[in-house]
């Protein structure tokens, strides 16, 4: 089993592996590979040229430090329970360290994964809050481009927040939308008559009015806060500074 950056001829295998691992639609997968994927931000394990597993990340920044947001690890069903996830995680840490990254972030989706990543050197560092609400009287808002969203987000981010721009926002915009109001900034995904506020910065009390303005009956929002455990962090050099807020989590 060899671990390396993927080649161009392996991309169709990576697409198939993603679908087998996560069950996403062809449209979603096409969006990721068109706007979020980069061979230099992927490590894949292959046996005789056949891709068995792959790890993907996005670049991020915190107080001048270069971070990697480890987004996904996909393993082919035929190669599961062979330690490939752990091998890819170890390889990624070594690779990122060699390329001058200061730290790595990831977001576990359950307590079991949180414990597993803890054994790999990751520790809890960030928190978030979430809430649901019904629609209220509409507030003024407007759609914004990813460039304007990036500029405004730097103004709204908490002082201990991670900057996520470039490919992060290009990919996010393939399935979500960006909005700005007088005192808030929102990245949101439409889901039938419900809205998922992936990140609401600024005035969280505007949430019911946001739903009213966009025509949704109810929604669920993630905001800065301390109610829930968030991202985990692994320093890749001595003295790397850990963030306290990591908001754009690609669920």
Residue ranges and their predicted role:
Residues 97, 118, 211-215:
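Non-catalytic positions within long, well-ordered alpha-helices that form the structural scaffold/packing
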Residues 228-251:
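C-terminal functional modules
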Residues 89, 96-109, 216-225:
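Conserved GNAT acetyl-CoA-binding A-motif
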Residues 44, 50-60, 67-74, 105, ...:
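Conserved beta-strand in the GNAT
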Residues 120-205:
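Amide-forming acyltransferase catalytic core, primarily the GNAT-like/NAT-type
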Residues 101-102, 109-127, 226-236:
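Conserved active-site alpha-helix within GNAT-family acetyltransferase domains
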Residues 11, 16-61, 153-178:
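Active-site rim helix/loop that mediates acceptor-substrate recognition in acyltransferases
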Residues 79-91, 206-210:
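Conserved acetyl-CoA pyrophosphate-binding loop and the N-cap/start of the following alpha-helix
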């Amino acid at each position: 089993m060899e671990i390396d950056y993927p080649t161009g001829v392996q991309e169709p295998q990576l697409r198939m592996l993603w679908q087998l691992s996560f069950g996403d639609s062809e449209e979603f997968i096409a969006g990721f590979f068109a706007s979020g994927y980069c061979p230099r931000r992927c490590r894949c394990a292959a046996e005789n040229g056949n891709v068995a597993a792959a790890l993907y990340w996005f670049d991020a920044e915190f107080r001048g430090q270069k971070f990697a947001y480890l987004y996904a690890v996909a393993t082919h069903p035929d190669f599961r329970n062979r330690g490939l996830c752990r091998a890819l995680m170890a390889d990624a840490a070594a690779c990122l360290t060699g390329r001058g990254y200061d730290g790595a972030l990831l977001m576990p989706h359950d307590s079991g994964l949180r414990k597993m990543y803890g054994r790999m050197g990751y520790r809890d560092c960030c928190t978030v809050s979430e809430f649901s609400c019904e629609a209220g009287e509409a507030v003024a808002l407007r759609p914004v481009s990813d460039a304007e969203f990036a500029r405004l987000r730097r103004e709204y981010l908490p002082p201990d927040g991670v900057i996520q721009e470039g490919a992060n926002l290009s990919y996010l915009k393939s399935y979500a939308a960006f909005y700005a109001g007088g005192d808030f900034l929102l990245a949101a995904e439409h889901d039938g008559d419900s809205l998922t506020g992936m990140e609401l910065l600024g005035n969280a009390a505007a949430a019911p009015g946001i739903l009213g303005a966009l025509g949704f009956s109810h929604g669920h929002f993630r905001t800065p806060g301390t109610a829930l455990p968030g991202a985990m962090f692994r320093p890749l050099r001595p003295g790397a500074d850990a963030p306290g807020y990591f908001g754009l989590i690609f669920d």
